[in-house]
Regions:
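Cytosolic nucleotide-binding catalytic cores of signal-transduction proteins
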Residues: 21-24, 130, 151
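Helical hydrophobic small-molecule/effector-binding pocket
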Residues: 76-116
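Amphipathic alpha-helical packing segments from all-alpha helical-bundle domains
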Residues: 104-140, 144, 159, 170
């Protein structure tokens, strides 16, 4: 896959906060710091993002786009949902280091807000979701389980977590 200059620029900007959060608290990091670390000017940063928190949202968006590109079906049954949950948790485990930095910076609320927005948008396309608050139940479950799992360094088995979450959605 060939990347455009814009995609490369965004990539470097998105990497910048995670590199800097290893050394500094997020609130201490300025847009100038992010731009400098990414090797771009402030104007370039603002061409892509309005504020530094938007970089984290783009990071989540990028992961979702990658995930959706690999997903080949729309879930219709318990097994389909189990496959998606397993894939999401596997991706989360691969991305645990950035999420640890987000958690350490106490910015996990941005992740929860993102999940709520994604699940509520998905509700409109998913005929199996009947209750208007169900997307928030799913988002909250994924958020809380993933954060607790992260606090345990993602030591639990993906299959066990998948079974637990799937059973909560589809009780016997």
């Amino acid at each position: 896959m060939e990347y455009t200059p814009d995609e490369y620029t965004r990539y470097y900007i998105v990497q910048a906060p995670f590199k800097l959060m290893n050394e500094y608290r997020f609130e201490e990091i300025s847009v100038s710091d992010l731009a400098r670390k990414a090797g771009v000017g402030r104007a370039t940063f603002y061409r892509y993002f309005k504020r530094k928190e938007d970089v984290l949202i783009y990071y989540f968006d990028h992961n979702v786009m990658t995930f959706r590109a690999e997903q080949r079906y729309f879930p219709r049954c318990k097994e389909d949902y189990a496959g998606i949950i397993s894939d999401v948790l596997s991706l989360f485990r691969k991305q645990k280091e950035p999420f640890k930095l987000i958690r350490k910076a106490r910015l996990e609320h941005i992740y929860l807000d993102y999940l709520n927005a994604q699940f509520s948008r998905t509700k409109k396309a998913d005929y199996t979701i009947k209750h208007p608050y169900a997307p928030y139940l799913y988002a909250g479950m994924l958020f809380n389980v993933s954060m607790a799992w992260l606090d345990d360094d993602c030591r639990g088995e993906v299959a066990d977590l998948t079974a637990m979450m799937t059973d909560a959605i589809f009780p016997a």
